[in-house]
């Protein structure tokens, strides 16, 4: 057929994306539109990978996904996909896909020291229920826990939070988003009283300058990067500045790169604020009407175990989140310490580049979009980093309007929609509510139709704390879903793996593939993936989007949602709730958790006749009602009327997502701004209505050093992260042949001078050693990542190179998010003789 200009451009873009990874596109990825001669059924879905939320069209034939291409009706990506997105059709069909439950069995009974053997779902659930009941009986709800995911669908995350909090009365539920988005979430709430960005992707087409803080968008958010570059090339006045600790593909295309000493981004942020004040660039009217000032407690520790010497020395380790009221003059004095000279000396960034950056923010005519991700958030002062970039936008009034936007990019497809909005963190409930707030618990109990006082008000164990408590034998029944924690947790040798094999613990892992984590578990449950189930994600711009089940999962694989709901049938309230609650509310006595949580007149109120006639829905047909619709509508009731309004369920299947709050059928692009946000009163201009006084907070916080730095023995900074071709731990992308061939294994990126000093050659095998553990990798002195002297980078996608054996389990003491970007290592070549002896 004839190819239109737009189709040709799309094909060229697809080829370019594949060329970046050094691969050819398969024929199915080039099939941009299905002709009548191709008997495929096409349906919409969001991409399975990052938090961008690209739309894809999924082609199905004979019960199998055989093709995907970018959805031209999707506003996010406009028909484009990155190289990972073009190979979505292959992620579900790895040769080692798990299709039946596995359990460590010897002589027909569970034995923690036995090998994993195939069992039935009933056998697996029966043993799980026995272990959960034993632990609850002997130790109570504090000894059971679950580690979830920003890759859970909204329905799965909501079901998990109900089962854990209302069923088992435990708040030991946390997502792997703790490792990537916790600092951003806490920064939003402490500044604006509500989580998630005020802007949206439309800002890309309006900004005059883009400032990237710790974000390699070209590889980690490539589709959004194309929008940045398109804006840059379309408008000659637009500029891009990238701040990082090393050079990468994003810095290559930036107008200015600022390579700073690890951790000193805080000093740069305070310098910019100081420049704005000293040069009369403060938007006084905005600040006086819309801003309060506070000062943070300092010397707050590093989130290590309480007995660690750094925690013992910290003045405010137990009061890390505390701040005090302040004023503009006090704030100006604090940031006034960050002079141009001091900042240059501390950061290693030249005065010229620092001034250019500061002038960009200070100029009232330049609309600025600040963008950040893991470089900011995986930081022992990540919450402060988020505060300090908001300070700049608030001082200048460059916020909540087209092109003026501080924007936190997300890493997982539903880190926003599931982890944050649903509230699967150990301290949260849906719609920004908190478990330690009695009024919030009361509201949840009313929506969930629970006895008053049932919900537990004690904040649960966060992700790193869960690993520590498993090791210490205090967390004994543990379920990991939709993540690969043993590969991605920090300090895994010392703090993570011991807990999995602790004889006192029973560990379950739900996963589609035999990951490192699955192989260490006591029970492995085979999980349905992506379009093998009906789902919903929420992306980085507050866009909620849904998809139908398009194919069936292989063998006995079941979705996380089915697993959670089916497992609840094995418990009655008498077995999991306190007797005083049942005595006071006898109507609940003897009921199964399934009946209390799901057959409650709310979740089960939509019948099977409402399911799309031309699509499967395994969970709903198993349980006899439209599960996903019931869960969504109950969940949505938390936020409607409170600034988190979601549209009716059916509307999402008609569109390519909607950005909340959705009021009177209309989505909101810019929050807190009159004329854009229906919650802002007429004549107010801006209202940050998450806070009672409707003002945002400027938080004064200084530079403080990282938890660990290089010394004479461990003389290199280690940075970890991702690469374009692989996603997270690689459990999906490493099973796609084209992506595997494009980047077959992790390497250690190093400056050539550092290699030469150590007598190392490119491609040579080396030992990367920290105070906690070591791995082997190979030296790379060329390529995409150009390291300054004294720093090395190792991606974490490779299960044969578990770089997190070396990382430090230091966290931001406020958000509890891990710092994967800063620890000290040494690198030693593997001698020929040593290799020969192995």
Curated annotation (Swiss-Prot):
The enzyme's E.C. designation: 1.9.6.1
Gene Ontology biological process terms from the UniProt entry: cellular respiration; Mo-molybdopterin cofactor biosynthetic process; nitrate assimilation
Lineage top rank: taxon: Bacteria
Free-text cofactor note: Binds 1 [4Fe-4S] cluster. Binds 1 molybdenum-bis(molybdopterin guanine dinucleotide) (Mo-bis-MGD) cofactor per subunit.
Record: residues binding [4Fe-4S] cluster: 47, 50, 54, 82
Domain 4Fe-4S Mo/W bis-MGD-type, chain residue ranges per copy: 40-96
Family under the similarity heading: Belongs to the prokaryotic molybdopterin-containing oxidoreductase family. NasA/NapA/NarB subfamily.
Its job: Catalytic subunit of the periplasmic nitrate reductase complex NapAB. Receives electrons from NapB and catalyzes the reduction of nitrate to nitrite.
Protein name stated in the entry: Periplasmic nitrate reductase
